[in-house]
Amino acid sequence: MRFCSRVGDRIASALLPALVTVLLASPACRVKEEAITGTFSDTFDRPELGPNWRDTGGGYRITDGQLVAGGAYNHPAWLRKRLPRDVSIELDATSRSPSGDIKIELFGDGESFDPDRGGYVSTGYMLIFGGWNNSLSVICRNNEHDEGRKAARSDRRVEPGRSYHWSITRKGGAIDWKIDGAPFLAWTDPDPLIGSGHEYLAVNDWEAEVRFDNLVIRPAP
């Protein structure tokens, strides 16, 4: 019996580090980032992305005081701050490519990405201006395709090199998106994405070079 006890102790000792690693990696044990309760802003006036952002694929850099994305292939750069449930977001965005494709994610999990350039399913909402070779703009819930598209328009194209000012609010399930002060797309989610796993913002990219600046996030009034 003493032999069995010693063997059991050795097995337990060998398995303990792995068990601890699994537990610490689980959502329940993960340390939550700071919540935005006032006004958060980022003008990107620095040489590197910095600790407030999680680059999941290396497709992001700071150039000329702007956050530049290119060839990220749906590896978002997640802001390490938790969004207010009702939120107001403003930012400036520019595509340098005729393919347009300016996009951000809202209320995602803060870490997910596309591992194989396959069909990307977001953990939050996707707002895409000039996607699919500058042919379609959408608000998506999770999936960018098919049933995931909740509001769409195809009558406006991204002009390469032009800076667009985005204003986005979510109150309850209602998402309202304006560009340069004019209504662009809106949709009300009957089952809003809220709580754990749905608290973060990201900028995202496929191939186009896209630049972001003057990000401001605050609780919606």
Feature roles, as predicted:
Residues 75-81, 152-157, 202:
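Beta-strand-rich interaction surfaces with strong enrichment in secreted/lumenal proteins
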Residues 58-75:
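Short carbohydrate-recognition loop motifs
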Residues 143-165:
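Short, aromatic/His-centered strand-loop micro-motif at the edge of beta-sheets
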Residues 188-213:
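Flexible glycan-contacting loops in extracellular carbohydrate-active proteins
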Residues 73-139:
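Secretory/extracellular carbohydrate-interaction modules
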Residues 27-29:
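N-terminal Sec signal peptide cleavage junction
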Residues 31-55:
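Extracellular carbohydrate-recognition regions
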Residues 44, 91, 160-188:
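Carbohydrate-binding surfaces in secreted/extracellular proteins
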